[in-house]
């Protein structure tokens, strides 16, 4: 059985440490547990890393589209690898959760996240799994809008705590991945 794990993020060096790229950062941590590297796949609108485990194949996907067009890459990978919607896990930032909190579940809404909205629209289904990683809200929403906040870099202290945060996330999804 093949499973897709898709990290939501924006391509480009200027976005590497932004809150919106937490999905890419999480995938980097997950990928470090396996041997291999991400390969560019223009036809899939992403880079990917294919991992064979005793429980099946896991394909890690980093879309090369921007966040709002994530569904295009998800659909291309779904078709190419022959994965069911239920075999897809999307890793995304969540401003409605405190920094460091996690939610893992299936059949849920987008919660205002444009990448998840687009994915649901393109797949015509919300039956995929979501790992929502809390990034918090702007401390002063009147002076810093949500878009500016998710495109801002993590603070020094937040960056220091990402590994522990991601370890919790990996532990949460391990049964779904089959290890």
Curated annotation (Swiss-Prot):
Where along the sequence does the record put site: Discriminates between blocked and unblocked aminoacyl-tRNA?
Answer: 10
Q: Which reaction does it catalyse?
A: an N-acyl-L-alpha-aminoacyl-tRNA + H2O = an N-acyl-L-amino acid + a tRNA + H(+)
Position of the signal peptide: none
Subcellular location, record wording: Cytoplasm
Write out the catalytic residues in the record. Answer: 20
Q: Which keywords belong to this entry? A: Cytoplasm, Hydrolase, RNA-binding, tRNA-binding
EC number(s) stated in the UniProt entry for this protein? 3.1.1.29
The record's annotation in InterPro entries points to: Pept_tRNA_hydro, Pept_tRNA_hydro_CS, Pept_tRNA_hydro_sf
**Pfam (any one):** Pept_tRNA_hydro
| Positions marked as site (Stabilizes the basic form of H active site to accept a proton) | 93
The top EC class is hydrolase
Q: One of this protein's GO BP terms?
A: rescue of stalled ribosome
Any GO molecular function: peptidyl-tRNA hydrolase activity
* Chief location: cytoplasm
Q: Tell me the NCBIfam families matching this sequence.
A: pth
Query: HAMAP family from the xrefs?
Result: Pept_tRNA_hydro_bact
PANTHER family reported in the protein's UniProt record? PEPTIDYL-TRNA HYDROLASE (PTHR17224:SF1)
- Provide the assembly information: Monomer.
Q: What is this protein called?
A: Peptidyl-tRNA hydrolase
């Amino acid at each position: 059985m093949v499973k897709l794990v898709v990290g939501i993020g924006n391509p480009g060096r200027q976005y590497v440490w932004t809150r919106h790229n937490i999905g890419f950062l999480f995938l980097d941590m997950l990928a470090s547990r396996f041997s291999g590297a991400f390969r560019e796949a223009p036809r899939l609108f992403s880079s990917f890393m294919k991992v064979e485990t005793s429980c099946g194949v896991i394909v890690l996907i980093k879309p090369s589209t921007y966040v709002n067009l994530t569904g295009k890459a998800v659909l291309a990978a779904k078709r190419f690898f022959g994965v069911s919607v239920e075999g897809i896990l999307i890793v995304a930032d969540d401003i409605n959760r405190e920094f460091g909190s996690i939610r893992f579940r299936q059949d849920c809404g987008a919660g205002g996240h444009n990448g998840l909205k687009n994915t649901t629209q393109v797949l015509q289904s919300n039956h995929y799994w979501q790992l929502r990683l809390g990034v918090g809200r702007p401390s002063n929403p009147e002076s810093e809008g949500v878009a500016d906040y998710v495109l801002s870099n993590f603070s020094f202290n937040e960056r220091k705590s990402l590994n522990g945060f991601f370890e919790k996330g990996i532990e949460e999804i391990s049964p779904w991945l089959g290890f």
